[in-house]
Amino acid sequence: MSWYAYCIAERNSFPELCRHRRPMPLTGVTGLFGNQIFLFPASELAVIVSEHSAEDSARMDQGAAKDHARVIAECFKLSTVLPFRFGTTFPDDDALRRSVRSNQRHFTANVERLRGKAEMHLKVVVDDICAHTGLHRDFTVGQHYLTNLRESAMRQRERQSKARALSVQMHRMFLPLAEEITCKRMESGKMLLDIAHLIDHKTVERYQNKYSSATHELKDCQMQLSGPWPPYHFVHRNSPAA
């Protein structure tokens, strides 16, 4: 039987597994395509899975990706979770057990590190200070090319400097345990900072209050907050399957 894997969780979070060594149904949560969710015991861990067929593989789309995230979010309400990538499957019980066994120490360490933690996600949009600095002069083709190169390099440095300053400001405001930040220029000419913060789950309300304060302090920024989420950005994977 082929298994579709959603995430790894702590076995002791599920009373259904206390007296069983075989996969047990998890009630109240449905998987991809309405398939039954099972708790697959593996030492001190449990793998959240559902049965998977060749027909299911042909139906993997954006809706299935949303269902994948939904199942992980539901399990996150019950346990620390280590999410699998969308589309992770195992051909049979033995393959699943081997994968968990070979990564046991890594998975266990991550569960310990992320227990009681949650991820908050911030999107911050600001005007790009470099968006309208183009100069209009009479240059030869060669001069124009070199000038464009210099201006492009200057704009990139200024953009990076502004992104660093803003990310430092965000760090000081929210004081996360860890963070992952990406920055890119949008088609509109504005700059987008995509920020993932790892925090203690018990401080979510405090974090939300800080967000409310930040939206009033940073008038030149458009901010959007989501979470708490499973710690997607903070699970360090060392194998293709997990």
Language model features with spans:
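An interfacial alpha-helical scaffold signature
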Residues: 1-242
